[in-house]
Every structure is written in C-alpha cells, then in structure tokens.
Swiss-Prot record:
It comes from the Bacteria. 4-CDP-2-C-methyl-D-erythritol 2-phosphate binds at residues 217-219, 243-244, 265-267, 270-274, 341-344, 348, 351. A divalent metal cation binds at D217, H219, H251. It comes from Campylobacter lari (strain RM2100 / D67 / ATCC BAA-1060). GO terms for biological process: isopentenyl diphosphate biosynthetic process, methylerythritol 4-phosphate pathway; terpenoid biosynthetic process. This is Bifunctional enzyme IspD/IspF. The record marks R16, K23, H243, T342 as: Transition state stabilizer. The gene is ispDF. Residues 211-371 are annotated as: 2-C-methyl-D-erythritol 2,4-cyclodiphosphate synthase. The lineage of its organism: Bacteria, Pseudomonadati, Campylobacterota, Epsilonproteobacteria, Campylobacterales.
Amino acid sequence: MLDISLIMLSAGESSRFNAPVKKQFLRLGEQPLWLYATKNLSSFYPFKQIVVTSGNISYMKKFAPEYKFVQGGATRAQSLLNALSMVESEYVLVSDVARVLISKNLFNNIIENHDKADCITPVLKVSDTTIYAQEAIDRDKIKLIQTPQLSRTSMLKKALEQSSNFTDDSTAIQAIGGKIWYVQGDELAKKITFKEDLKSLNLPKPSWDIFNGNGFDVHEFGEQRALLLGGVKVHENMGLKAHSDGDVLAHALIDALLGAAGLGDIGELFPDNDMQYKNADSMLLLQNAYTLVQNYGFELVNADITIIAQTPKMKEFKEAIAFNIAKTLKTTPNKINIKATTTEHLGFVGRKEGIAVLTSVNLKYFDWMKL
C-alpha cells in the first residue's frame, strides 16, 4: 500500500464566489463544504495524515479534531507549502475543498498510475471551439487541469520552494523538469468557483438547525459625551465609560452573534487594549462582526434585546433602535425586538450608576439554494 498523505486546501477568500458566505463554509446538510469534501475523499484510502489549510484553525478544528490544520498563506502555493511542512509520507494527494464530488473511480485511476511520473494529474478535454485573442486555437492541445493531484512529496516541496507563482502542482513540478502523467478527469470533479456552479451539482441542502447565542454587557456612566444605544443618541451627555464609544447594546449584540456562530466573543475580535478601537463606532464593529458571522455560513433569524436601565427612559427610542440595528445588519425591523426594564431601584442600575443590556439571537445556516 502506498504511503500517502492528503492535503485539502481550504484557506481561500472566495472572492469570485460573490456571496456573503465563503464557499468552504456553505452547509451541505449539517456539514460545512470543506468537511464534506474532506470526508468524501478521505473515505477512499487510509491516508497517513490528513492536513487542511485554514484561515481560522481554532474554529475548524472543532469540526474534526482528528485532522491536522495549518494556517493558510497569501496564495495557494504558500498555503500548500505550509501544509507540506507537516507531511512525512512519500506521496501527497492535494485537492481543493471546492471540488466536493470527487468519485472513487477518479481517485483509483490516479493511484493506479502513481509510478508513471512525478505528478499524476486528472484533465478534461475541451469540446467547444476555442478562441484566444481573436484566433482559433487547436482545442486538442488544450487540457483543463483538475485536482486531486498525486505527487512525490519531495518533488513538490522542491518545486514550490523555487517558485510560489504556480496555481497547481503539475505546472510547478513540470517547471523544475519533473514528469507529468495525465489521466482522464471527471465532470463531477468540477470546482465551485462561482455561485452559479452550485446549481450544476446535486448537493445536499443546508439543514434547518437553529443556533442560539446570548450576550450581556454593562457599562458605567461617567463620560461627558452622548449616550448611544444601538447607534441611536438617547441622551446628550450621559455617556458610558468604555474603550470604544460605549454603545453597550451593540457590544452585547456582538457577543450574542458570535456566540450563536461559535466564533468566540467580542474581546477576542475587538480587544479593548488595541488602540485601533479607541473611541470606535460600535455600530461599525457590529457590522464587521455580522459580516464575519455571514462569512462562516450563518444568517440572522431574529434578535431579542433587553435594555436594563433606571435612567434615562427608553420608550421613545425603542423603535429607532430597532430600525437602526436592522439597517446595520441588512435585515428587516420585524426581526429585531427591543425591550426595556428597570431593576426597581435595586443594584448598580437601580442606583443610576450604569446600564446593562441582555441580548439573545437566533441564527440559521445560509440558504445557498436561493442564490
């Protein structure tokens, strides 16, 4: 049996996908796409190691602690080099997680030809007339390169150490004089690059699971500046002490969103000892936090927010706060509920020393079927 490790590339920014969610975090059933693709390919062979490149190791490790994770680089080649530093096997199979339907027949065809060259590469032929710079070119000379590709580990490392400008393994190895062997590819191994590509593949729909998160924050009165709640000015000079602008409602809501998505807390995302957040606009922080939540495959179902304050009175501001939060999160105000209460003069809130906010949000998986 061949000594092979598997590398799955999953650190891309999905810039061409043009959707709120990064494609590797689209949910297929309950699994993120990267995990679905990795489990599919890893089921074909007892790989020595399974290494996944990642932009957020701590988050992805929660899904599959048995895998090895490595930080992605600025380019595909740099990510691959990082992953290769963890590989000890004679051969390495490299694939993109965006190719989710790789078949066992394709895999077997690659493995069976392992001794033919330094890199075994699946390709598709071009059937349509092909034009380059207004000139027709011989389509029989064109090959569409796919993954997975099987390489001798030492050869691939050597190739990428000499140049990191290549977008696939075979061209990197060929550039240093290595031999390439092409095998017939598979239409099902199509890479998801644009959102339209999803519609051509028979993939499981995202599950209907709901994820709840809670947030709580409290700030003390004491700054001679406006009191902001949900980005709405509630009082001219009853400002709250804070590293940022003191919007305690926005802070609690950020924590609830991050909690529901399993992405940590506000202190990790926006540290209060980081000067870039000094006097920061908390609604901008909220917007950035929700963008992150969307990137990881979630969208808002609803938010329920309780403002706990003895003073000032909140009744006349609740609607404006709900509308402003909805605008920031690019949703409709019916999904944002604002409540206000006092502590009946008990505790620090009752003594009018500060304001507390309790939030609860529900998230669901982004429905990529509607793209």
